[in-house]
């Protein structure tokens, strides 16, 4: 490992800049990569919305949902099929792309076509995976495990910076509160900003997830996504992570907590208003 370096206070993915004191940016897209046509449909719609609103947007989707509740659940198209789709979205639509990785060997290949590698919450302490992601030189977004205290993320980030990569994002996505339930502690946002020094993202859709709550799949309460998103942005964050879908009720995964695409623009517009107020008066820069 290299000598530890400090995480960057702002990171740039394509034309999108994340920083706790900078204007709000968005990471958005469907839970999983369903098809090329579906991915391009959603990405095109999101680009139009972001352009109208004047906000930076990173497209996200998963080529493999490797931690589904049931072995029978749909997992996605896989990395081989995903890479040309990711490249098309990035190169032809001009949107930076984020996807999650689950195995060390996936990192270098995924990095060929995406701007941000995401470490899933369940894997956030897997040292070798963090190092493999860091070694690509891409931005690494680490989801805080539902089992971790926010101050524990300092050790997670230090694994990446010890590998010589200062481009880190940390994401809050709720903490376990009894069985099949997550809650959001808004104190975690400034705590992670202070402890890690990295830009902080709030995942508003997975925070309303009910893990395993439907027996063979996870449930969710999407009606609370706007509530938690407004609260997080009022605290002050670098960005929000929001999964969205044209027809969430028929999505292959995480439908109960995804925001319908038709409601996405109004939500982001409101969050931008909250963000402007929070950062105008914040003394914590922003968290």
UniProtKB/Swiss-Prot annotation:
Keywords: Cytoplasm, Lipopolysaccharide biosynthesis, Transferase. GO terms for biological process: keto-3-deoxy-D-manno-octulosonic acid biosynthetic process. It is found in: Cytoplasm. It holds the Pfam family DAHP_synth_1. The keyword Transferase applies. One of its GO terms (molecular function) is 3-deoxy-8-phosphooctulonate synthase activity. Its EC number is 2.5.1.55. Gene3D superfamilies: Aldolase class I. Its main location: cytoplasm. It catalyses: D-arabinose 5-phosphate + phosphoenolpyruvate + H2O = 3-deoxy-alpha-D-manno-2-octulosonate-8-phosphate + phosphate. InterPro entries: Aldolase_TIM, DAHP1/KDSA, KDO8P_synthase. Pathway: Carbohydrate biosynthesis; 3-deoxy-D-manno-octulosonate biosynthesis; 3-deoxy-D-manno-octulosonate from D-ribulose 5-phosphate: step 2/3; Bacterial outer membrane biogenesis; lipopolysaccharide biosynthesis. GO terms for cellular component: cytoplasm. HAMAP family: KDO8P_synth. Belongs to the KdsA family. PANTHER family: PHOSPHO-2-DEHYDRO-3-DEOXYHEPTONATE ALDOLASE. This is 2-dehydro-3-deoxyphosphooctonate aldolase.
């Amino acid at each position: 490992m290299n000598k530890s370096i400090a995480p960057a206070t702002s990171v740039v993915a394509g034309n999108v800049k994340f920083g706790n004191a900078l204007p709000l940016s968005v990471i958005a897209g469907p839970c999983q990569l369903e098809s090329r046509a579906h991915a391009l449909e959603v990405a095109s719609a999101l680009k139009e919305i972001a352009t109208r609103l004047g906000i930076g947007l990173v497209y996200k989707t998963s080529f493999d949902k490797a931690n589904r509740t049931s072995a029978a659940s749909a997992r996605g198209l896989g990395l081989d099929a995903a890479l040309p789709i990711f490249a098309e979205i990035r190169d032809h639509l001009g949107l930076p792309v984020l996807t999650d990785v689950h195995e060390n060997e996936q990192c270098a290949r995924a990095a060929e076509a995406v701007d941000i590698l995401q470490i899933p919450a369940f894997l956030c302490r897997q040292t070798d995976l963090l190092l493999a992601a860091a070694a690509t030189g891409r931005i690494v977004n680490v989801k805080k495990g539902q089992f971790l205290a926010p101050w524990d993320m300092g050790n997670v980030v230090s694994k990446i910076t010890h590998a010589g990569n200062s481009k880190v994002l940390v994401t809050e996505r709720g903490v376990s509160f009894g069985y099949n339930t997550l809650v959001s502690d808004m104190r975690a946002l400034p705590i992670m900003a202070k402890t890690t020094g990295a830009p902080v993202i709030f995942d508003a859709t997975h925070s309303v997830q009910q893990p395993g709550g439907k027996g063979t799949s996870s449930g969710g309460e999407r009606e609370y996504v706007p509530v938690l998103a407004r609260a997080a942005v009022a605290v002050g964050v670098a960005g929000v992570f929001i999964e969205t879908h044209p027809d969430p009720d028929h999505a292959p995964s995480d439908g109960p907590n995804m925001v319908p695409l038709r409601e996405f623009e109004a939500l982001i517009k409101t969050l931008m208003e909250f963000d402007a107020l929070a950062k105008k008066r914040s003394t914590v820069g922003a968290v």
